[in-house]
Amino acid sequence: MATSAIQQSSFAGQTALKPSNELLRKVGVSGGGRVTMRRTVKSTPQSIWYGPDRPKYLGPFSENTPSYLTGEYPGDYGWDTAGLSADPETFAKNRELEVIHSRWAMLGALGCTFPEILSKNGVKFGEAVWFKAGSQIFSEGGLDYLGNPNLIHAQSILAIWAVQVVLMGFIEGYRIGGGPLGEGLDPLYPGGAFDPLNLAEDPEAFSELKVKELKNGRLAMFSMFGFFVQAIVTGKGPIENLFDHLADPVANNAWSYATNFVPGN
């Protein structure tokens, strides 16, 4: 098929050339002839975060970026030193894994900090610190979700483990196996019921939101790693560590903890 389509104008009977990647939309009738307008459907987002001129990971010194990183996808800064994305199938898999882990990390970062914030503002929890909360199940009263026994009351670690494995295992197995649910939808951005606010209605705005999601997701993954390290080194939650640092920045910082840390203490 040729790259241009011929459109007959009903206004003057003249022939005009229009790109074939445009979408035909009927808007009215004039003098018995159909009047049509065309809305261009862009093949790539017109955003500074996409394409060959997008920001690179080394700014103006990033000239020799891999040829397979073209800026087609969100979050592509041209950095792949290890060549992990050279194979298209591996690249697609890594993109999916990054988006999924980004979303889990953002939820995790919220779950690690929000209970501590609420606790410091008078909301009572059985245990607000994220890495200590699970141990409440071994207490005599068991584990109450949000400190309320009327919500979720758990007393068996084996039951929680079994439910977690069954539910998550089923969902992940279904996703990887490619069940019929969701056929024809983008596996990463399905839309529909998963977009109740219709944030993806505007393609340009949606392309920007994809970049923002990955930026925040990558930051959240680093944050979760930091929370793990804090828990091991200080034995405190992220909010308590923040308050300690603000109270005495010289004594409570990464350098002082790293130089004084003794494993097992």
Curated annotation (Swiss-Prot):
The chain crosses the membrane at residues 151-171, 219-239. The modification Phosphothreonine is found at T40. Residues 1-37 form a transit peptide. GO terms for cellular component: chloroplast; chloroplast envelope; chloroplast thylakoid membrane; mitochondrion; photosystem I; photosystem II; PSII associated light-harvesting complex II; thylakoid. Its main location: plastid. Chlorophyll a 6 binds at H245, A254. Chlorophyll a 1 binds at W79, S85, E98, R218. PANTHER family: CHLOROPHYLL A/B BINDING PROTEIN (PTHR21649). This is Chlorophyll a-b binding protein 2.1, chloroplastic. The gene is LHCB2.1.
